[in-house]
C-alpha cells in the first residue's frame, strides 16, 4: 500500500498538478491531505477544480487547516476583510471567489482524526478514516496497519505550531496512540523519532520554505512488512507560469504588500510572507497602533528588501 501525504497547498494549482502527475506514475492507493488547501493564490476556482479532480481520481483522507478555519469564521461571523488591504485582502479575494459548494466542502472537513487499516467486503486491506470525536481506546489497537494520526498543526489544535513549541511535539509523541503523527503548518519538511513514535511533516506542497523556491514538497508512505516506510520528495513545478497567473489575476490590487511578499517567498523559499507580517506587528506595537494601515506594511516591505 502506498499513501501520499500533502499539506499547505495555499491555492497553488500549478504545484498540485505537477505532484498529481508524479503520483500517477507511483501508482499510489490514496492521498492524505493535512489542510491549508486554499487562500492567498490567484484564481481560487482553478485550485478547487484540481482538488475535485484529485478526489475523483484517488481515495482522499483530508483534514481542515487554519486557512479553511479563517474562511469558515468569516462565513459564520464576518471578519471585516477588505479588498486591497495587505492585512486581509488575500483572504477576502479567496472568500469572494468560493462557491457555496466549496464552503460546504470546507465545513464538512474534520479537524483531525486517525487513519486505520480494515478489511473491505472483498477481504482487501484498505485505509479508513475515523474522526477524532469517534476515536476510542481500541481504535488504533484494532488497526490492521500501524495507525496514522492526522492533524494540521497539532492534535486538537489546528493552529498549534511545533516549530515554535518543540516541547509540544514531544508531549504529543509521548502520549500518541497511533504509530505516526502526520502534521503540517510549518511549511518545512521534517521527520522526528521520539518515545518509539514518528512525527512526519511532508512540507508545503504550494509554499515550501526550503531556501530554494519553485519546488513542491510532499511524502509517500509505503507499507512493507507491517511497517510504514517514509520517503520525502521535492519536485520542481512551473514557477514562472504560476507567477504569471498572479499578474493575470491582478492579485496585487487585492492583497497589496502581502501579495508581493507571497511572490517573493515562492521565488526564494524564504518566508517573507511571515517576516512581513511579523515586522508589521512589531511596528504597530511600537507605535501603540491597533489598525495595521498600509503605511506600516510598506515600511515593513522596504525594511525587508
Language-model regions, residue ranges each:
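Active-site neighborhood of divalent metal-dependent phosphoester bond hydrolases
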Residues: 54-137, 145, 163-172, 177
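Active-site-proximal beta-strand elements of phosphoester/diester hydrolases
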Residues: 2-10, 146-155, 199-203
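Core catalytic region of metal-dependent phosphoesterases/phosphodiesterases
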Residues: 4-6, 11-97
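Active-site environment of divalent metal-dependent phosphoester hydrolases
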Residues: 10-15, 39-42, 67-72, 114-115, ...
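Acidic, His/Gly-rich catalytic cores of divalent-metal-dependent hydrolytic chemistry
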Residues: 194-202, 206-305
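Conserved hydrophobic/aromatic beta-strand scaffold that supports enzyme active sites
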Residues: 112-114, 150, 191, 218-220
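Ligand/cofactor pocket segment of small-molecule handling proteins
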Residues: 153-200
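Glycine-rich phosphate-binding loop signature in dinucleotide/nucleotide-binding domains
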Residues: 23-27, 144, 175-177, 220
Amino acid at each position: 500500500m502506498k499513501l501520499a501525504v500533502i499539506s499547505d497547498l495555499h491555492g497553488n494549482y500549478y504545484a498540485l498538478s505537477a505532484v498529481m502527475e508524479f503520483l500517477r506514475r507511483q501508482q499510489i492507493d490514496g492521498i492524505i491531505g493535512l489542510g491549508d488547501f486554499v487562500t492567498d493564490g490567484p484564481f481560487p476556482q482553478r485550485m478547487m477544480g484540481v482538488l475535485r479532480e484529485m478526489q475523483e481520481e484517488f481515495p482522499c483522507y483530508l483534514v481542515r487547516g487554519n486557512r479553511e478555519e479563517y474562511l469558515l469564521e468569516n462565513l459564520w461571523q464576518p471578519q471585516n476583510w477588505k479588498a486591497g488591504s495587505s492585512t486581509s485582502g488575500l483572504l477576502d479575494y479567496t472568500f469572494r471567489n468560493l462557491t457555496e459548494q466549496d464552503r460546504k466542502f470546507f465545513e464538512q472537513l474534520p479537524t483531525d482524526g486517525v487513519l486505520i487499516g480494515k478489511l473491505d467486503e472483498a477481504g482487501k486491506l484498505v485505509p479508513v478514516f475515523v474522526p477524532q470525536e469517534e476515536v476510542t481506546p481500541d481504535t488504533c489497537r484494532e488497526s490492521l496497519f500501524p495507525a496514522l494520526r492526522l492533524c494540521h498543526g497539532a492534535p486538537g489544535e489546528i493552529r498549534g505550531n511545533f516549530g515554535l513549541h518543540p516541547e509540544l511535539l514531544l508531549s504529543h509523541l509521548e502520549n500518541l496512540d497511533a504509530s505516526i503523527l502526520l502534521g503540517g503548518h510549518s511549511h518545512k519538511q521534517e521527520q522526528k523519532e521520539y518515545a518509539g513514535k514518528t512525527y512526519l511533516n511532508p512540507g508545503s506542497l504550494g509554499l515550501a520554505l526550503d531556501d530554494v523556491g519553485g519546488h513542491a514538497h510532499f511524502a509517500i508512505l509505503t507499507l512493507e512488512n507491517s511497517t510504514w516506510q517514509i520517503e520525502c520528495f521535492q519536485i520542481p513545478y512551473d514557477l514562472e507560469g504560476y507567477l504569471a497567473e498572479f499578474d493575470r489575476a491582478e492579485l496585487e490590487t487585492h492583497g497589496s504588500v502581502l501579495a508581493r511578499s507571497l511572490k517573493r517567498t515562492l521565488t526564494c523559499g524564504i518566508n517573507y510572507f511571515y517576516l512581513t507580517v511579523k515586522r508589521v506587528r512589531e511596528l504597530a506595537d511600537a507605535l501603540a497602533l491597533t489598525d495595521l494601515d498600509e503605511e506600516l506594511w510598506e515600511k515593513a516591505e522596504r525594511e525587508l528588501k
